[in-house]
């Protein structure tokens, strides 16, 4: 039986990076979580980011198991490397990437489940000015990206696709989901609560 996604899930695993055009990530989805975006100010305090209508800007955190075919780096901070097959990593999607995920979910044709496969391949980049507005045309080669002065901000974007999970990767992703969301039980826990916790599995 497939496990529907939507519960809160916040492990601190390495984040998949987009550092060059042509990088591929393939993963089995373990869980997803929406959260409000924040930005650290000059005083070191994080403040919420809001849209023009006053609503909070959001991002999507997708926890995955790395599948074969991945060559995109992952890491936390400056420590990055190509993850091994089976490693747990996170995709952090915001802005256009978040919108692309929503479209990919619609194209999947059903509710996303643990073990479904996400495929991401970086295919373009965009230079932004100091105010965060796009500057010039999208870039499509790494040579163009490398020629951009370091003083300018470059965002690298990817095409994203969701596919139904298959075989052992569903089993592995479901095991990871259960391990991460397990609720410790004590001797004083009410019997009805124990039954409710076990019911979905």
PLM regions and their residue ranges:
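Acidic, gly/ser/pro-rich intrinsically disordered tails
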Residues: 1-9, 161-201
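OB-fold ssDNA-binding interfaces and closely related basic DNA-contact patches used
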Residues: 1-84
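Short nucleic-acid-contacting surface segments enriched for D/E, G, S/T with interspersed K/R
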Residues: 98-121
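OB-fold/S1-family single-stranded nucleic acid-binding modules
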Residues: 119-182
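Short, structured beta-strand/loop micro-motifs enriched in basic residues and often containing a Trp
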Residues: 87-103
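Positively charged, low-complexity intrinsically disordered regions
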Residues: 91, 151, 192-194
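Hydrophobic beta-strand residues in large extracellular and virion-surface proteins
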Residues: 27-32, 60-66, 89-93, 112-120
């Amino acid at each position: 039986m497939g496990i529907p996604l939507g519960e809160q899930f916040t492990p601190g695993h390495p984040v998949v990076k987009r550092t060059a055009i042509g990088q591929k990530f393939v993963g089995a989805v373990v869980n997803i979580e929406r959260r409000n975006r924040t930005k650290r100010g000059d005083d070191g305090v994080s403040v919420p980011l809001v849209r023009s209508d006053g609503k909070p800007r959001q991002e999507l955190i997708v926890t995955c198991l790395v599948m074969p075919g991945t060559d995109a780096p992952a890491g936390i901070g400056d420590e990055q490397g190509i993850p091994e097959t089976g490693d747990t990593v996170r995709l952090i999607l915001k802005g256009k990437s978040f919108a692309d995920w929503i479209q990919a979910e619609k194209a999947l044709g059903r509710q996303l489940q643990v073990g479904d496969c996400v495929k991401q391949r970086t295919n373009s980049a965009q230079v932004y000015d100091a105010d965060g507005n796009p500057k010039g045309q999208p870039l499509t080669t790494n040579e163009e990206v490398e020629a951009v002065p370091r003083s300018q901000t470059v965002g690298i974007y990817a095409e994203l696709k969701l596919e139904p999970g298959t075989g052992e990767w569903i089993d592995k992703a479901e095991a990871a989901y259960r391990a991460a969301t397990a609720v410790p039980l004590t001797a004083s826990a009410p019997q009805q609560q124990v039954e409710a916790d076990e019911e979905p599995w």
